[in-house]
Swiss-Prot record:
PROSITE patterns: CYTOCHROME_P450
Example GO molecular function: oxidoreductase activity, acting on paired donors, with incorporation or reduction of molecular oxygen
Protein name: Cytochrome P450 71A23
Name of the gene this protein is made from: CYP71A23
Cofactor(s) needed: heme
Enzyme Commission number(s) of this protein: 1.14.-.-
Amino acid sequence: MILFLCLIILFIITILFFKKHKTVNKIINFPSPPRLPLIGNLHQLSQHPHRSLCYLSHRYGPLMLLHFGSVPVIVASTAEAARDVLKTHDRVFASRPRSKIFEKLLYKSRNMASAPYGEYWRQMKSVSVLHLLSNKMVRSFQDVRQEEITLMMETIRKSSSKPVNLSKILSSLTNDVICRVALGRKYGVGTDFKELIDRLMRQLGTFTIGSYVPWLAWTDWVSGLEARLEKTANDFDKLLERIVQDHEDGDGDKTDFVDVLLAAQRDKSFGFDIDRLSIKAIVLDAFVGGTDTSSTLVEWEMTELLRHPTCLKKLQEEVRTICKGKSSVSEDDIQGMEYLKAVVKEALRLHPPVPLMVPHQSTQDVRLRDNHIPAGTQVIVNLWAVGREAATWGPDANEFRPERHLESPSDFRGQDFELIPFGAGRRMCPGISFAVVLNEVVLANLVHGFDWQSIDDETDVAESIGSVIRRMHPLYVIPSSTT
């Protein structure tokens, strides 16, 4: 009897499911893989959804419709599909969907990266760009970058040709640079600061069943996810509150980003009100967007160079020729290093630190390739798939070959859609200049100052799980000083 009742309930739920989504299927006619009742296509996503979505796109096309539970999601997987979303219909798809993860960890999406498109987002972006991320501000941080790179090189040199955890060293470097330019001093010494950032970044990539299947939201509580998110949010808020309080108490002899925000709160110099939660949310953006992503890129660059010793030798020859007789590489030296820039582009193509762009959401009805897309539809651009598209990059699209960029004018600043690791359009990452200059000068100094030997399996390119895709295992290497 109980089994019979369960079957009836399941039958009714299935009928309601297909009735509810019949309209969506008629409106959005992009190819779509078969889905299951209630969960949609969620069962087809692996721990690395960028890979799963890429493989599905090979069968269902560059613009395909999936259902994450009850939520229809369009996935763009080629350069032209990305152009349609991020350029042709940029304004329409400039907003963000609501997310339990963002609500919990990012001050209810009050930060710039996850805020809905509108006046608040424009205000937060203008503040961050003007006072932290503009080319002028990035140049003003040159001494900080050089000082921290010098400390990093000294740390490596002290290893005396013993194995070092380069992943850990790079993470410390980027954290310290971000802390100094945004907060005025380091906060990672003698604290669990770095562990907290790692936890935050892992959880930002966590899947919450309740966001897509509302009637199963209780499973997030039973699994302990709700409690873990709450703890991370509280721990980070305590840290940010301490940082803000330190600045209010006048702890520091130079004006930094937090000081600017607090001054604007007092005298309303921005022309709009900015409250304490918004200040903490903007500061949080600096860590979310600038720490893991920056260290991860250098980590993948070194991984690929060690796997391709001919490329490493070629890069070292270029850097050491240009910087002959110098003890280190300056940012001015970088300008003439064409092969270095090609290596950076190739690493960004194969290993975009954030392989799936933060989901976009349409603010109004729109026609996308002759399909009517209703307002509120989510769109995900798979940067990992775009960077490995054979039609664009050729039959060796999955191979690390920096030389391809010496033969191509393509750049990663949002105009060439075959290479958009920082996104494009209105929601493009505003920290691109900050990230690129740090990455180039760090990589150049590493290959200039040391010869490198891997102690790991050189074929190991296993990926971690999370919003930022790092190596699954830390990169251990043996450096040999050249000076």
